[in-house]
Amino acid sequence: MKRIITYIFTIIISFSVCSCTQYSNDFDLKKDTFNINKVSFDKLNQYLLEQFSNIENSELNFTFSVSEETGEIEKLYSSYSHEYIYLDEDITELFTNVKNSFTYDFSIVSITSTRISYGGEGNEMFVYSLDGKKPKYFWADNKDAAFSIYSLDNNWYYLFLKQR
């Protein structure tokens, strides 16, 4: 009986260690990908703040419009002004670079007084904290979804659902 309990305990510990290692490896890969595209993230932050920080609204959300011909992001749709914002080639390239950091969908940018969030279908997000504080919520359909937060760099965080 002791052998069976020891065997079961060993299996449980093994699965736990493997699971933690997988998350660590996933995060290391995500951090490397972020670092490759960090300049694009930072330039987009600067662009977004210059263009939209003067708007009096608690949250600005933008979704992408993708060209049917090229498959590239060509404009943003503003849910605040209900209009399309056409992007020049340099900004389009920055969005394309940022998109390469995502394993899942990247289709939304959200700006609040405390953060700029890059995300999509609610599986993962890159968040820049404007107030220097760790993000406290994950932008997803299920507001109670369990998520993890990893610090990437000064004020940059990677958030992802624990069960995807």
Where are these regions (language model features)?
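Bacterial Sec-type N-terminal signal peptides, specifically the leucine/valine-rich hydrophobic h-region
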Residues: 14-17
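Extracytoplasmic electrostatic interaction patches
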Residues: 74-164
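Sec-dependent N-terminal signal peptides
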Residues: 6-11
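N-terminal export/targeting and maturation segments
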Residues: 19-95
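Positively charged n-region of N-terminal signal peptides that target proteins for export
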Residues: 1-4
